[in-house]
Amino acid sequence: MRGLINKFTGQTKPYKVHVNTSAGVVTGLVRIQLETRDPQLQNTQVDFSVEILEAPQGAGATKRVTPGAAHTSWIAFHSHLLQNGVYTIQWRAGDCSDQIRVQVRNSGELANQVSTQLHSDQVPLFLTDSCDSALYRHDDAALRPWYDQPDCHARLDQLLDTGRVPAELESSFRQFLDEGWFEIENHLDDGLINRLNAAMDHAAQTGDSGFTPGSSQRLQRMHIKYDSFWDVTTYQKTQSVIDTLMQTPSTACQVIGFINGTQQAPHQDAIHLSVFPQGYMCGAWVALEDVQPDSGELVIYPGSHRWDLVMMKDAGIDKVSHARWSEFANTVEVRWQKLVDQSGVEPMIYRPKRGSLLVWHERLMHGGSRRLNKSLTRKSCVTHHFAQGGIIYYDSTGLPGRVIERDAKKKLLSRKTVRQLISQILAR
């Protein structure tokens, strides 16, 4: 099955756990999720405990959870605080218990920096409550990416001189330094664009995505069913550009399709798609048709990536759960709009040609304009990319983050194929 990430599962009825892993390898913040398929147990509280047997004495955590509540029925651990190697995870739920073997593999300069910082700040190994930006020392300038340093233009000169940034990307990267975004025209292969558009049309017509015709709804998790969306998340040209920008390998965490403009208010992505160290996430948006005036075009506020970043601890509100966003809208979104109003920056309406790639900084203020002509579509898709070696979490909801494995085998069966095979077996 193709999913957000491959899940290495340990199962002991009536409970099972899912671990964020790829073929048994774990990195960053590792989430261990307790689930049950027994309807009678889904809303029944149980003591859930996790222990890492090879870790220092006392490396365990316990919490009381309700398996049917996905937002709270998990325990996570910072794998950066462990040496790379194989570990045994012992878990228990009520009278049930089992073990899972995983391999911790945090590699690269960024991972080493994060590990050192977590040890220095005595960040706990286990998390049993919400993930929050207050856990990490985001004010350490040494941890920021090169493009967020005061001498970023001089650093770009060095990267160009040493060949770590090709000359053809210089103007794009300088615009990123000054304005927080850049565009590369004719980026996406025309054949892939046709496949992406066909997939969205099919999803909208069949209702598979829950899309309501004419609405501004997003098409989520399309890569699970449609190969074209899987391909765009691992598109080599996009990966190369973002890896070069970050100066470290990156991985996409999601892909979203759009048939129409979102009409979304100005916002920063970092509160939803969060990373430590800050700065190591960016959006990659691709136009799947020529964007027309009045279609609900993207709106960008150039230079807003240098504005204050609003996180949940700054807003002083509870994490969002069960899709209850009203408090978030009344606090965080109000603060975003205040930043826009106080800046005096004129919004830029973005009307790209088909196949153009737009890359933006995690702090860039952007949104969707009003759809003045509802007959016009604005077909596009977006992926968000994290640098490998960082800690991925979602500050708005307090959940550990996940990624789409860039090197995963593409011969994995789709859900549709699995359903067909099951039907054939049952029909025999």
Predicted regions and their residues:
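Short, compositionally biased P/S/T/A/G/V-rich stretches that sit at domain boundaries
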Residues: 1-39
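Aromatic sugar-binding surface patches on proteins
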Residues: 68-76
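Surface-exposed, short loops/turns at beta-strand junctions within beta-sandwich domains
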Residues: 79-85
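Edge beta-strands of extracellular beta-sandwich domains
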Residues: 97-106
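Non-heme Fe(II)/2-oxoglutarate
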Residues: 117-161, 310, 314-318, 354-359, ...
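Non-heme Fe(II)-dependent double-stranded beta-helix
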Residues: 126-178, 184-268, 272-277, 396
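Short, conserved beta-strand element in jelly-roll/cupin
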Residues: 276-293, 351-354, 359, 384-388
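Double-stranded beta-helix
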Residues: 294-365
